[in-house]
Amino acid sequence: MTDRTSVSATDRILIIDFGSQVTQLIARRVRESGVYSEIQPFNTVTAASIAAFAPKGVILSGGPASVTAADTPRAPIELFTMGLPVLGICYGQQTMVAQLGGRVEAPDHREFGRAFVEVTAGCALFDGVWTPGERDQVWMSHGDRVDAIPEGFSVVAVSEGAPYAAIADEARHFYGVQFHPEVVHTPKGAALLRNFTHGICGCGGDWTMAAFKDQAIARVREQVGSGRVICGLSGGVDSSVVAALIHEAIGEQLVCVLVDHGMMRQGETEQVVRVFRDRFNITLVHRDASELFLGKLDGVVDPEAKRKIIGATFIDVFDEEARKVGGADFLAQGTLYPDVIESVSFTGGPSVTIKSHHNVGGLPERMKMALVEPLRELFKDEVRDLGRELGLPDEMVGRHPFPGPGLAIRIPGQPLTREKLDILRRADAIYLEEIRNAGLYDVIWQAFAVLLPVRTVGVMGDARSYDFALALRAVTSTDGMTADYYPFDHTFLGRVANRIINEVKGVNRVVYDITSKPPGTIEWE
C-alpha cells in the first residue's frame, strides 16, 4: 500500500480490494479517465483511513470468497454512512447488499464468461451508455448472486443468471454490478466506470502525467534535500525513467552506476551510456564486469541458480562501485505499483514462487541507505508516458521488457559461454529489426530469441552442418500477467529464419513458440 499522502491529487478514488485477480484493471481504467486511484486491501481499511485518504468515491472489488460463508471479507460498515458514492463490483456488490440488509444466495446456476444484460431502468451509472430495453455484452465470473436487495435500491439490469445484474440507490449514490466493467470483455465497461468517477463522484479528470512529474520532482527534492542519490541503471525502462526524473529534481546530486554483466542485448549498453552521459549529462559510472559474471556462471545450468548468482554478484559489484564514488545517502529503485500491491496475501499464506525476481533488494540494508522510489504509484504504461514527458527517446521508453539476468535466461538447459551469448545476441537483433521493419514492434508486448540446448543436422552448401536450433517468441499482452502468442504470417517467419541462418554462424534451424501464458510463462526460464 502506498503512503496515503504521496500523491497530491484533489480528486481520488479508493479501491477496496477483496482479492480479485483483476483489481489492478479497475485502477488502470480509473486512471485512464484522468482520475488518480489507489488500491488498499480490505483488511487494512478502516473508517479513519478512508477519511484520511479523502476519496471522492469508493469502489469495492470482486474477490474469490463467498458472502454466504462466515468470516469472509467485508467493507467497514461506516463506509455506508460517510456520504461517499460507492460502486460494488461482483463480490463488492454482494457484500454491500449483505451489509445493508439484503440477501445473497449460492444458486445451482453460475455465470462465467461472456453474458448479456438487459437494461430495465435508467440510472446515473448508465447515462449516455445504456438505455432501458437495451441488451449488451458483459463479462461475468460469479457463483453467488444477489437474491434480495436492501431498502432504497432498485434493479436496473438483469441477466440470465443474475436477476440483480445491476442495482442502484440513487439517493445515496450506491451502485452494484454483478459483472466486471473493468475487463475489455465488457465493451462499455470503461464508459460505466467513467460515469461513476466523473458523473456520480464529480471528479474533474485532471490527473495527468505532466502533473505527476511535477509532484514527483517536488517529492524527491523534499526527501533528498542536499543528500546524494545513487541509481543502478540497467538499460530497462524503469531504471531509465527513475534516473531521468531524479536528475531533473536534484541534478549533480545523482550518480548512476551501469553494471554490464555481459548479457545485455546488442547495442544496449552503448545506447544507455550515450543517452545518459552525453544527452542528459548525468554522472555515469560504467563498469564492464562481464568476465566476473561469466566466471561465476561457468557450468551453471539451473535457472534459479543463474538468477541468484547474477543478483548476488550485481550487489557485490554495485557496492564496490558505490564506495569508489564516495557512497550516497539514498538508493533509487524502480519499484512500480504492481510490486507494491502484489505483496498482499488475502489467504494469510505464502504465495508460490514461480520465478525469483532479480532486483537490488539486498542493497539498502547492506549499504545503510534510504530508498527513493518515485515510480511506486505508477503502472508500467504510465512509466512509459512519464519517460516521454521527461524527454527520453522513444526507442528507450518503448522498449520491450527485458529480464534483469538478461540473455542468461534465454540460453536454457546449458552452460553459458561468450560464443553462445554472441550467437543469441546477433540472432535476437535480426529478429527485432525485422519486427520493427514490419511496423509490429509497438503492437507486440515482448519479442525475443532463445538459443536452445539442441544441435540439429542440416545441409549448408554441400556440407553437413551440426549447429544450434533457435526459438523465436513474441506475445501480445496488456500487463504481462496473461499473454498470447503473436500470429505472424508464414512469409514473415520465413524471412526472419532465412536471415538468421544466413547471417548468424552457429544456427541452422529456427522454430516459433506458439505457447500462451498460462500454461507457459513468457520467458523460457
Curated annotation (Swiss-Prot):
<keyword id="KW-0067">ATP-binding</keyword>
<keyword id="KW-0547">Nucleotide-binding</keyword>
<keyword id="KW-0315">Glutamine amidotransferase</keyword>
<dbReference type="InterPro" id="IPR001674">
    <property type="entry name" value="GMP_synth_C"/>
</dbReference>
<comment type="subunit">
    <text>Homodimer.</text>
</comment>
<feature type="domain" description="GMPS ATP-PPase">
    <location>
        <begin position="207"/>
        <end position="399"/>
    </location>
</feature>
<dbReference type="Pfam" id="PF02540">
    <property type="entry name" value="NAD_synthase"/>
</dbReference>
<feature type="active site">
    <location>
        <position position="182"/>
    </location>
</feature>
<dbReference type="Pfam" id="PF00958">
    <property type="entry name" value="GMP_synt_C"/>
</dbReference>
<feature type="active site" description="Nucleophile">
    <location>
        <position position="90"/>
    </location>
</feature>
<dbReference type="InterPro" id="IPR022310">
    <property type="entry name" value="NAD/GMP_synthase"/>
</dbReference>
<dbReference type="InterPro" id="IPR017926">
    <property type="entry name" value="GATASE"/>
</dbReference>
<keyword id="KW-0332">GMP biosynthesis</keyword>
<keyword id="KW-0436">Ligase</keyword>
<dbReference type="InterPro" id="IPR014729">
    <property type="entry name" value="Rossmann-like_a/b/a_fold"/>
</dbReference>
<dbReference type="InterPro" id="IPR022955">
    <property type="entry name" value="GMP_synthase"/>
</dbReference>
<dbReference type="GO" id="GO:0005829">
    <property type="term" value="C:cytosol"/>
</dbReference>
<feature type="active site">
    <location>
        <position position="180"/>
    </location>
</feature>
<comment type="function">
    <text>Catalyzes the synthesis of GMP from XMP.</text>
</comment>
<feature type="domain" description="Glutamine amidotransferase type-1">
    <location>
        <begin position="12"/>
        <end position="206"/>
    </location>
</feature>
<dbReference type="InterPro" id="IPR004739">
    <property type="entry name" value="GMP_synth_GATase"/>
</dbReference>
<dbReference type="InterPro" id="IPR029062">
    <property type="entry name" value="Class_I_gatase-like"/>
</dbReference>
<dbReference type="GO" id="GO:0003921">
    <property type="term" value="F:GMP synthase activity"/>
</dbReference>
<keyword id="KW-0658">Purine biosynthesis</keyword>
<dbReference type="InterPro" id="IPR025777">
    <property type="entry name" value="GMPS_ATP_PPase_dom"/>
</dbReference>
<feature type="binding site">
    <location>
        <begin position="234"/>
        <end position="240"/>
    </location>
    <ligand>
        <name>ATP</name>
    </ligand>
</feature>
<comment type="pathway">
    <text>Purine metabolism; GMP biosynthesis; GMP from XMP (L-Gln route): step 1/1.</text>
</comment>
<dbReference type="Pfam" id="PF00117">
    <property type="entry name" value="GATase"/>
</dbReference>
<protein>
    <recommendedName>
        <fullName>GMP synthase [glutamine-hydrolyzing]</fullName>
        <ecNumber>6.3.5.2</ecNumber>
    </recommendedName>
</protein>
<dbReference type="GO" id="GO:0005524">
    <property type="term" value="F:ATP binding"/>
</dbReference>
